[in-house]
């Protein structure tokens, strides 16, 4: 049976081999001019978790588990700090029970058990959080993680309205495989796609692969059905509405504190068969940023409009030696994309970009929409492969003292230059102070008419055993800089426990009080994911 790794991104079969760990040590040793010895990864046999403090009632016993490996998988997400703690077998506060309800009635029963007993109930989708979004809280006599993997079906497809009724526990690949025979797709591909779920996307306001226009899951939701301790919350299925504050907008981004999302009607579309892409190089990152702004303000809406800094261009798209690379991509189920890519390239060239006509890739393969997708070409294809493989590569660096993480934000165009300078300086200063040096890179993951969503990556060589403290100091410096420069603490990674201090600065106090009032009605005993977004 294939099991999820309790420490690495992916399944146990995806954990790095001894040779891969050795090669990572050699590569980092050469990069930082030090000598590192590879550390063998932990195994499930080394787990020794605190014994469960609670026992499920007999009516729920057949959907509950308390085995160490299962509880370890449901303790941490997949951020740097999560990976290091799990690699070191550091599990001081695991959930006591993992419940896997098979229907809404069992979800209700689990929540009733938790509410009546005072146990924390933690919704769990795919476990890919990088912000401690489902990490068990302290101060509870028991913690029950509610894993929705059994609710993983596309229940209904409305091909006239191009929408589908989908259960919240469906993983990205399973969702697409169920839509594909009908010629449809949802076209929402976060980097966590392989190990994340629809309910998790909605609860965390996930950002997908569309770099412009429909960037977030918000744009694809027709209605949401959510089970709360107080009852069922279901919004009316509508293409749009002006009837007061939206129930959907309260559920979207609620991060599991108001209820468990069991179903949603989602907008879907025909599978694209026409594609066009281009990789345009620029003398400076600033020039590339200006081109991206002009492209999106022209309202061409490329599906891909990502700007990579030199380090990222070399690593992710095989374009070494170029200061900046703007990846452009268009797609459609019905319309050839030649004119759109040519228009975008003209804008990019006028802004100082360089690309030969031969490097503009156009694919007008109009085969059956139930078949697999046509391949991407050139720099865009190389970037896509690197994007999907990146989480796996981080597994190889665990246990070597290497400190690395990503941080994302969004800011208006007028504030972008100052935020860029401020955050880069804060990160580099912290790396110099904490690690004795390191590198900072940036890319745009999403671009709006009024501003970009920059994504910063930092890395440096830390001290083995002190990585978490070093990481925390760097993270705080950069987060403080983001807030001071007018950015958001997160564009698409969510708030979780990790971003809570800065989220408290960002949102109005009266909004927090209002959210508390909503929670007091839906979750009167305060058992759902306590500590996220607001204090209980």
Residue ranges and their predicted role:
Residues 474-512:
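C-terminal structured "cap/appendage" subdomains that terminate the fold
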Residues 24, 37-41, 62-86, 270, ...:
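C-terminal substrate-recognition/cap domain of FAD-linked oxidoreductases
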Residues 496-536:
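Activity-critical C-terminal alpha-helical subdomain
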Residues 152-306, 527:
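FAD-binding subdomain of flavoenzyme oxidoreductases
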Residues 1-112, 130-162, 310-317, 373-406, ...:
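N-terminal flexible segment immediately upstream of the FAD-binding catalytic core
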């Amino acid at each position: 049976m294939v099991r999820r790794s309790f420490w690495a991104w992916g399944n146990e079969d995806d954990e790095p081999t001894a040779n891969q760990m050795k090669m990572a040590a050699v590569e980092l040793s050469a990069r930082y001019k030090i000598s590192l010895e590879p550390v063998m990864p932990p195994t499930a046999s080394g787990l020794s978790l605190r014994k469960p403090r609670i026992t499920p009632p007999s009516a729920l016993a057949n959907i509950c588990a308390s085995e160490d490996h299962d509880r370890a998988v449901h303790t941490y997400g997949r951020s740097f700090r999560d990976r290091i703690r799990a690699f070191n077998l550091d599990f001081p506060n695991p959930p006591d029970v993992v419940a896997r309800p098979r229907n809404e009635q069992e979800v209700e029963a689990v929540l009733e058990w938790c509410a009546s007993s005072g146990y924390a109930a933690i919704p769990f989708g795919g476990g890919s959080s990088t912000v401690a979004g489902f990490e068990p809280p302290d101060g509870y006599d028991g913690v029950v993680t509610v894993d929705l993997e059994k609710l993983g079906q596309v229940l209904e497809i409305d091909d006239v309205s191009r929408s589908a009724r989908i259960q919240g526990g469906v993983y990205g690949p399973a969702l697409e495989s169920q839509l594909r025979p009908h010629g449809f797709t949802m076209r929402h591909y976060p980097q966590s796609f392989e190990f994340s779920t629809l309910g998790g996307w909605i609860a965390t306001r996930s950002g997908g692969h569309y770099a412009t226009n429909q960037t977030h899951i918000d744009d694809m939701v027709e209605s949401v059905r959510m089970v709360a301790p107080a009852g069922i919350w279901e919004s009316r299925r509508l293409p749009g509405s002006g009837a007061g504050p939206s129930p959907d907008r309260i559920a979207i981004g609620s991060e599991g504190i108001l209820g468990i999302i069991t179903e949603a009607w989602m907008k879907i579309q025909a599978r694209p068969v026409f594609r066009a892409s281009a990789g345009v190089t620029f003398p400076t990152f600033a020039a590339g940023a200006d081109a991206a702004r002009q492209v999106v303000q022209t309202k061409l809406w490329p599906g891909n409009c990502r700007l990579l800094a030199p380090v990222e261009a070399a690593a992710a798209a095989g374009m070494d030696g170029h200061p900046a690379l703007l990846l452009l991509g268009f797609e459609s189920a019905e319309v050839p994309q030649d004119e759109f890519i040519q228009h975008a390239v003209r804008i990019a060239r006028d802004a100082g970009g360089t690309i030969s006509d031969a490097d503009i890739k156009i694919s007008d393969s109009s085969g059956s929409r139930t078949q697999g997708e046509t391949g991407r070409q050139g720099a865009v294809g190389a970037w896509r492969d690197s994007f999907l493989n990146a989480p796996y590569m981080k597994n190889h660096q665990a246990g070597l003292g290497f400190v690395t993480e990503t941080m994302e934000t969004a800011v208006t165009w007028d504030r972008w230059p100052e935020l860029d300078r401020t955050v880069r300086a804060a990160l580099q200063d912290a790396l110099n102070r904490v690690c004795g040096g390191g590198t900072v890179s940036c890319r745009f993951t999403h671009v709006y008419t009024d501003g970009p969503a920059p994504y910063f990556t930092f890395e440096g060589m830390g001290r083995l055993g002190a990585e978490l403290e070093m990481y925390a100091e760097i993270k705080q410096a950069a987060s403080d800089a983001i807030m001071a420069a007018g950015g958001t603490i997160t564009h698409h990674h969510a708030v979780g426990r990790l971003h809570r201090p800065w989220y408290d600065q960002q949102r109005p106090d009266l909004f927090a009080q209002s959210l508390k009032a909503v929670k007091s009605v839906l979750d009167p005993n305060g058992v759902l994911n306590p500590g996220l977004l607001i204090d209980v």
